[in-house]
């Protein structure tokens, strides 16, 4: 029986069940290029479906990668009818929350007690903006919003959402949120069970059912936790380069993901030289680096023999703009052949 795993992402690109795809790894290894490439290939392979690519990295790069401006609202990629992008902007989201709090304060008759004046100055946004993990929390809220929209038939509907995540530490905090919130809400539930009437009276004229709101939030968080741990719905694609530190961090990331019960079976290895196949450009430095890369590639192949390990070439130019991304991303669907495809890495269009 042949247990060989294909060295490409063909099965994921053509998947009809996945709703959430996370792309992550160490900083500077090509996560954004990889997430854009996965999103493009899925959109090209399944033209009847809609895909959304979300950047949860504070150093948003989607706009730079595609060469067009994206913001906090999803917008179609020029030249692709079924792929949209958005960049979650924590500062803009916090300002929106601040404005909402001002409106609520005025509605509840608190406009004259100074609270509205404080909030008008952006105090809530300033305070919450300094809380560690706020970026991850806002990204999580975006996931909750999309699930709610899908269930209620509201807003734009997307068959699959691809996440261009922040470097490893931020991503792990984001993925911990469902479990953390679930435990936190359980504790809150115990408190509200004992102090419910008093808490509801403190809610004021708004007559907010705090216990009901907490239960609703807990149900939504549990739905996300269940979806994130369902391998048919969610998977994580690790991105690395063939160097010691990147390999070490990838292993740590994979072990953490396994502890969260998340599916992870794909690794993209970027920036490979394939020096012995390129006699025309094979300098001593290239030979030395390729020798080092092969050493760690051998370790990757040994450690992750049951993973889809996709080996991507180092291109001569920048992989920016839709046309260049299409050329590069094709090697996710059908693995790069350094002999047959060697010329492609020198044929990228220059971008200003």
From Swiss-Prot:
Keywords: ATP-binding, Cytoplasm, Endoplasmic reticulum, Golgi apparatus, Hydrolase, Metal-binding, Nucleotide-binding, Transport, Zinc
Subunit structure of this chain's protein: Homodimer. Component of the Golgi to ER traffic (GET) complex, which is composed of GET1, GET2 and GET3. Within the complex, GET1 and GET2 form a heterotetramer which is stabilized by phosphatidylinositol binding and which binds to the GET3 homodimer. Interacts with the chloride channel protein GEF1.
Binding site for Zn(2+): 283, 286
List of catalytic residues: 57
Protein name: ATPase GET3
Similarity-based family: Belongs to the arsA ATPase family.
Domain of life: Eukaryota
Disulfide bonds: none
Annotated ATP binding sites: 26-33, 243, 270
UniProt cross-references to CDD domains, sorted A to Z: ArsA
Annotated organism of origin: Vanderwaltozyma polyspora (strain ATCC 22028 / DSM 70294 / BCRC 21397 / CBS 2163 / NBRC 10782 / NRRL Y-8283 / UCD 57-17) (Kluyveromyces polysporus)
GO MF, one example: guanyl-nucleotide exchange factor activity
Entry function: ATPase required for the post-translational delivery of tail-anchored (TA) proteins to the endoplasmic reticulum. Recognizes and selectively binds the transmembrane domain of TA proteins in the cytosol. This complex then targets to the endoplasmic reticulum by membrane-bound receptors GET1 and GET2, where the tail-anchored protein is released for insertion. This process is regulated by ATP binding and hydrolysis. ATP binding drives the homodimer towards the closed dimer state, facilitating recognition of newly synthesized TA membrane proteins. ATP hydrolysis is required for insertion.
A GO cellular component entry from the record: Golgi apparatus
